[in-house]
Regions:
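Conserved small/polar residues in nucleotide/adenosyl-binding loops
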Residues: 335-342
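Periplasmic-binding protein-like
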Residues: 58-66, 85-87, 175-184, 208-212, ...
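An alpha-beta-alpha
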Residues: 22, 109-152, 156, 237-259
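Extracellular/periplasmic periplasmic-binding protein-like sensory domains
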Residues: 185-266
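Hydrophobic alpha-helical segments within soluble ligand-binding/sensing domains
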Residues: 99-121, 211-231
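Flexible loop/hinge segments that line or gate small-molecule binding clefts
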Residues: 77-100
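Extracytoplasmic "Venus flytrap"
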Residues: 1-21, 25-29, 36-43, 66, ...
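Structural motif
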Residues: 34-53, 159-171
Length: 343
């Protein structure tokens, strides 16, 4: 099983999470498979690297970035016996399956905690790439915050924008409660991850960490392949497949620290259980965009396609989706493949 990474696990929390999943896979199937990983795979090198790992014997390949999709299609057609899966949302192709996780479920719960703890009703959300899935995360967080605090306002910043300065952004907007990158990286094991609170003396008080359990997803995929059900899915459907799993499948979770008040944690645990059972969905009821447009009707659950393809922000978000020209050069190629039409 080969894993293709656009960066290295040391420098990216996204890649680090996937690499933890790869290690979990090796521990789960020690006698049935082995894994290899290739770091720093650029869009231009994708086809070459794919052919290299196939020559090394890889018959299952996980690509963890959407920009690899385009140059993978030729390889997938040339090697129909090799299973190639790309980690992206809404980019399915009949020759390549895609997979992603419903992180917005955890963000909704994280937003609830943020709303309950933001004394001045101001909360920061620091996003990275404006791709499919990210906008749903932001909006779910904003809806969660309004669930516990109707006055809450979400101040949005993009860490990949040219003029990004976290500390200045927080100071200028008088913000203490912050939703930042999802987890630490080995090279930068700081406290600025997940949901945290900035104290007046400058300390960071960690509250919540959303968790991508990629190991669980990869385990389920390998089990499906070993059992023969992966191929039967393909034969019976005859169309592109996009795996989009969440808390109910164990692929997404939320870890609360002891710094979260007991009453708030009890509420979050209860709602997390309801989300797992399907009794509660974050995108339900009347939802309006920043311009007042009605995006979801009362007593209705939003359709999955509408969640995947969001290119708008809820009416309690202050900020906007950046244009390509506002992103740093290294972020443009990552964003380009599945950028929103507003970019």
């Amino acid at each position: 099983v080969a894993f293709l990474y656009p960066k290295s696990p040391d420098t990216s929390d996204w890649i680090y999470a996937h690499d933890l999943g790869r290690n979990y896979l090796e521990e789960t199937f020690p006698d049935q498979m082995k894994t290899i990983c290739v770091n720093d795979v650029t869009e231009e090198r994708t086809e070459q690297v794919l052919n290299d790992v196939i020559r090394q014997g890889a018959d299952i390949i996980f690509e963890v970035a959407p920009q690899m999709m385009k140059d993978s299609l030729k390889v997938a057609v040339d090697h129909p016996d090799v299973k190639i899966l790309n980690c992206s949302l809404n980019t399915s192709h009949k020759y390549i399956r895609t997979y992603y996780a419903r992180m917005y479920e955890a963000k909704f719960l994280s937003g609830m905690i943020a709303g309950a703890l933001a004394e001045n009703d101001r909360i920061a959300y620091i996003a990275d790439y404006p791709i499919y899935g990210m906008i749903a995360n932001i909006n779910a967080f904003a809806l969660g915050a309004s669930f516990t605090n109707p006055r809450a306002r979400i101040y949005l910043a993009w860490s990949t924008s040219e003029n990004y300065d976290r500390e200045r952004f927080l100071k200028d907007n008088n913000i203490q409660v912050v939703s930042d990158q999802d987890m630490i990286t080995p090279r930068d094991p700081g406290r600025q991850f997940g949901l945290y609170e900035c104290s007046k003396d400058g300390r960071k008080l960690n509250l919540v960490m959303p968790l991508w359990n990629w190991g669980v997803f990869y385990e389920k995929m390998i089990q499906s392949i070993l059992a023969g059900s992966y191929q039967s899915e393909e034969n019976s459907e005859g169309r592109a497949l996009n795996y989009w799993w969440g808390m109910s499948a164990g692929v997404i979770d939320l870890i609360c620290s002891k710094n979260v008040p007991t009453g708030v944690k009890r509420l979050v645990d209860h709602l997390k259980s309801d989300i797992k059972k399907g009794d509660i969905v974050p995108f339900y009821g009347e939802i309006r965009a920043q311009d007042g447009t009605l995006k979801n009707k009362k007593d209705k659950a939003m359709k999955p396609e509408a969640i995947m393809e969001m290119d708008w922000l809820t009416d309690n978000v202050i900020g906007e989706i950046p244009t390509m020209g506002e992103l740093r050069a290294e972020a443009v190629s990552y964003t380009h493949l599945r950028a929103h039409e507003t970019l």
